[in-house]
C-alpha cells in the first residue's frame, strides 16, 4: 500500500512540476506512466509483504498493486490535477527554531496560486474532518508556507485518492491553521526534543492502526 502511494505521488509530481510554467496538465497517459515508473522504482528498492500477500505469488501481488496505481493515477489526472495551479511542488523547507538545538524540516506536496497547502494521500478509506483538523503534518506545512511567502495559508487540505474493493474515488477534507496552532506545534516539538535528548522512546500502543504489520515498517524487528 505504501509503494502504490509512492507511485501515485511520482505521477502527480511529474505533472505539477511542469504545470508551474505551462499552466496545463499533461495527458493522463503521461501522468499514469510516471506513476507506474515511480512504483516500479520503489519496488526495485525493496518491499515487505503482509502475511496474506506472502501466501500469494510475489509477481501476482506486484501486478495487482501496479493495476491499483494505474487506477489511482487515472483518477488523479481526471479529478485532482485540474483543480490546482501550483506555485511550488515538493517544496523543501527548513524552519529554524529559536533557542533550539534542532531545526524543523519538511517537504510540502503542493502550494497553489490561491495560497492553499495541499497534502496528497492514498488510502483505503476516507479521511475525517478530525484527521485534517488535528494533522501535525498540515500544521508544519502551514507554518512553512507562512515562512516562505509571508502569508497565512488560506486553507490546508487533505486530498485523498481512496481505493476500496469496489471503486476508486476522491475525498477532500479542508481545514485552517493559525497562531494558536503554531504555538501548539512549538510545544510539541519541545516535548519530542526533550524525549530524544533523554533517550525516552515510548512504544506505540498495541491495537492502534499504525501498530500493525500492514502500516509499520519496523513490525518485524519490534520487541
Task: Name each model feature, range by range.
Residues 1-223:
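RecB-family 4Fe-4S metal-dependent nuclease core
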Amino acid at each position: 500500500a505504501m509503494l502504490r502511494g509512492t507511485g501515485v505521488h511520482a505521477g502527480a509530481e511529474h505533472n505539477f512540476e511542469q504545470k508551474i510554467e505551462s499552466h496545463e496538465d499533461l495527458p493522463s497517459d503521461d501522468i499514469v506512466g510516471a506513476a507506474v515508473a515511480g512504483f516500479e522504482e520503489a519496488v526495485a528498492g525493496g518491499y515487505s509483504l503482509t502475511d496474506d500477500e506472502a501466501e500469494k505469488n510475489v509477481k501476482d501481488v506486484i501486478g495487482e498493486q501496479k493495476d491499483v496505481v494505474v487506477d489511482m493515477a487515472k483518477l488523479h489526472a481526471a479529478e485532482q490535477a485540474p483543480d490546482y495551479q501550483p506555485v511550488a511542488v515538493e517544496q523543501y523547507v527548513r524552519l529554524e527554531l529559536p533557542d533550539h538545538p534542532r531545526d524543523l524540516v519538511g517537504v510540502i506536496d503542493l502550494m497553489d496560486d490561491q495560497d492553499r497547502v495541499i497534502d496528497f494521500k492514498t488510502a483505503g478509506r476516507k479521511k475525517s474532518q478530525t484527521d485534517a483538523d488535528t494533522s501535525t503534518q498540515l500544521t508544519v506545512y502551514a507554518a512553512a508556507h507562512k515562512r516562505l511567502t509571508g502569508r497565512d495559508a488560506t486553507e490546508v487540505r487533505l486530498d485523498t485518492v481512496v481505493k476500496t474493493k469496489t471503486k476508486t474515488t476522491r475525498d477532500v477534507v479542508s481545514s485552517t491553521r493559525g497562531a494558536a496552532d503554531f504555538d501548539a506545534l512549538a510545544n510539541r516539538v519541545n516535548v519530542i526534543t526533550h524525549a530524544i535528548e533523554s533517550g525516552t522512546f515510548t512504544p506505540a500502543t498495541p491495537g492502534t492502526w499504525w501498530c500493525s504489520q500492514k502500516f509499520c515498517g519496523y513490525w518485524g524487528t519490534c520487541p
